[in-house]
Amino acid sequence: MNFKSLDWGLFLILVAALAGQASLTMAGPKQPLLLPVIRQTSSIDCGLAALAMLLRDKASITTSVAALVNLAAVLVDPTTARHRREGYSVSELQTLAGAFAYSLQARNLTLEAFYKRSFPLIAWIDPGNGGHFTLVEEVTATSVALADPTRGRLAIPSNTWRELWLQKTTGIVLELE
């Protein structure tokens, strides 16, 4: 190997990979690299798991549910900390994203506007248990691909997605900016 002609960025990646600190994975244009689903660790931290995946996938920030729980203990006002009983609110997730110098924008979208968004994004769905945050990875004409903190990676038929996501005529998404 001729090190004089080797690109320095590639060289550093190669050194890190050889040292076991990174992995080199080549994905073709039709085969996106699917990163592992970050699972929720309790019944109330789906929002934290979805935020951890969104930070990783959109901003290359690696964090964990446990780290976000610890961060919330510092940043979230304990007098309004409903998350200990009911899970994290949109406002609390926005506060946590702000700690990483990112803005988490909540939007009410029609189904048509949802299909035009840039993915991944967090969606709030109601599977009948009072609400749940999940990461939407990709949308096609027939299905919605999720990295779900509870159930793992799955594809939901479009008609089922409409029932889970739409609250009358709009649904809620959270986008990292």
Regions found by a protein language model. Name each.
Residues 3-4, 17, 41:
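Residue-level recognition of hydrophobic positions within alpha-helical transmembrane segments
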Residues 9-19:
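Bacterial N-terminal signal peptides
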Residues 20-38, 43, 52-57, 62, ...:
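Conserved active-site-adjacent core of cysteine acyl-enzyme catalytic domains
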Residues 46:
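Active-site-proximal loop/helix segment associated with metal-binding centers of metalloenzymes
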